[in-house]
Amino acid sequence: MHDPVKKSAHLTAGSTSTAEKLCFDKNEFMKANFSVDEFLHKNRNAPSLEQLRDNLGLYLKGLRAAMIDLINEDYADFVNLSANLVGLDQNIKTIQQPLEQFRSDIESIHGLIDENVTELRAQLEEKRQLREFKRGLQSLKKVYETINKLQDLIDRKLSGEQPIKAVDLERAALDLIQLKFHEKHCFKHLSPDHQGKIQQLEEQLHQHLRRFFNDALSQARNSAPESLERCLRIYITLNACDQAECAFREDVVAPYMTGVIGEQQLQNSPQGLAGIYSKILNFISLHMTDLLRLTLYSDKFPGFNFVVNSYWSDVETRLELHMNSIFAPGNSEVFYVKYKCTRDFLGKIEELLTCSGEQAVTFYRQHKQTKSFEARWNLPVYFQICFQEIAGKFEAQLEPVLQEDSLKDNLTDSDYKISAFNAAKEAMTRCWAEGVYLPEVFPKFYKLNVQVVLRLSRWITDAITQSKGSNFSKPYTRNQLLIALHADIRKLDAHLPELQQLIIKSVPVEQCTKIFSDVLAKSMSCLADTLGAHLTNIQKTLVELLIGECETENVRQVNDLPRLYRKTNREVPTRCSSYVEQMLRPLKAFAQQNESQLGTLVVEQILAEVASHITKAYFNVVSDVLTSVQKTEESLRRLRNVKSGGAATVSTGSSAVMSDDDKIRVQLRVDVTSWRQELCKLNFQATQIDKLVELTNMVEDSIKLKDNSA
């Protein structure tokens, strides 16, 4: 037989001659997912349906011709195939009946096997039940025997007033373990009476074991710890460590604490709460030394935790019920002392547990009674009281904004000049002071620090605003207030790094991470920026005040120079006018009085702005005066020309007498030169002052221009 792929290729090749004439792709018919609808949809744009039909007819003829050629080429194979199919049905019928019989036999065997499996499972289940019943009967027999044996042992060896021997308790404990084991396997066969009897025996054994435990504790204090060790081992054997802890709490801890913890004992204690805690801690050294040596300080007897489950449980319950006055937060100072004393007490318990490992400390911290005890201390209320005390005292210094005594005198180097800053520093320092700060409320105290600085910042803004008011009337001047503000802000800004270190020392150890340090540094930087923003505002206000003192009336006196020199026959000016000194006097006084407080750099910045502003106004006035003088001079020249009938004017350049206009120009030059020289004495270059170079050039040029025209 030929390869099917080859035949398909042969059929396709047979229609190749017509492929070039077709209006569709003949390969579409060879696809496995060929669809007539899709074929018609793709060829909907054919020239016409008639042409599509004709092309399909041509393609069909080509396929038929190719198929005939294929049959002719492989004729022998086709004939053999037909011959082989003759009698095939008869052969199939011949093998069909044996196969069906074989299937029937297999199904019957499957059914037989299933029946046997079911029967076997039933027998195994019956055997299991019998075995379980047998074991139950055996356990029941053991239970009866052990009950009698244990009862006899308790009656003979453990009851009565005679001392209990450890060996008898150990035998009884083993019998009880065996009894509990067999009880579990025959529980459904036991009568209620026997179940009650087992419970009764267990309770009796624990009572005798409890008595032996108390005797062993007494003997251990007398240097005989062997009985205590055997007793603890019996508790471990019975898996009753909690019973030992309960017995110790009720029989040893509770009687002692009854006489120690109470409101009356607290009132009668000379040392107050610290004395109560000292007595509570003394119990450990008095009654728990040997017990802790065996259970806490070694792994010899695992499973016991007498410190938490016996000692601390009883102490915490009594503190909450019989001494709840210690939790009252009404008086912040008393609350702080009690809370710190309590934290020290809890810390000593943790220190005791540290010997057993971190797991014991964690168990103590996460214990429900520890959580309950810590929750009783109302720290939010305590902080609120501290907040009212600290913030209230600070706020009292800020209202009203400016008081008669806001500016202090005779202060030390560590004090601020303004009382509001002293109050702010005191408030921030008090947040971290001993007797106020508690690590558990660190975020709240830190937030209060930030609030104090921001509130002070708001007060500074209000103080600057009031200093600009027209009704300012205080024992101190505006300048004194602003300069004190400037100095105190810089001093407080320099104090922030010291405050940052104080906060880092106060933060709880577990929170003092690199992330916290970065956040704290960023926060302090923001506070420094907030304070620093006021420095610019203060300098601007000082500039405005100085300009008001120097400029308004003094600069206008330049306009009086023409009136002073015209037709007055004054001498040629050689000294500067008085207004120059009047403009300079406030600048010199400001530099002399405030350089030590503000610093040379700040004073120079303020004076430079003031001098620049004055010089600009001075430049404008001088320019107007020179222009006016020039116009007046030209008007007089034209008038003389008219009177002389147009004849050439007589030159005055050779005259020894200086004109009034020239005297005005000379006076302006003397004044400007003096202004410039005095500014240089204040350590200013001409280029540092706006319009000073232009002003100097303008008066010099006016003189030169006059000389040239002459």
UniProtKB/Swiss-Prot annotation:
It comes from the Eukaryota. It comes from Drosophila melanogaster. Keywords: Golgi apparatus, Membrane, Protein transport, Transport. The keyword Nucleotidyltransferase does not apply. The keyword Membrane applies. The lineage of its organism: Eukaryota, Metazoa, Ecdysozoa, Arthropoda, Hexapoda. It is a peripheral membrane protein. InterPro entries: COG2 (IPR009316), COG_complex_COG2_C (IPR024603), COG_su2_N (IPR024602). Belongs to the COG2 family. Component of the conserved oligomeric Golgi complex which is composed of eight different subunits and is required for normal Golgi morphology and localization. Pfam families: COG2_C (PF12022), COG2_N (PF06148). Required for normal Golgi morphology and function. This is Conserved oligomeric Golgi complex subunit 2. It is found in: Golgi apparatus membrane. GO terms for cellular component: Golgi membrane; Golgi transport complex. PANTHER family: CONSERVED OLIGOMERIC GOLGI COMPLEX COMPONENT 2 (PTHR12961), CONSERVED OLIGOMERIC GOLGI COMPLEX SUBUNIT 2 (PTHR12961:SF0). One of its GO terms (biological process) is protein transport.
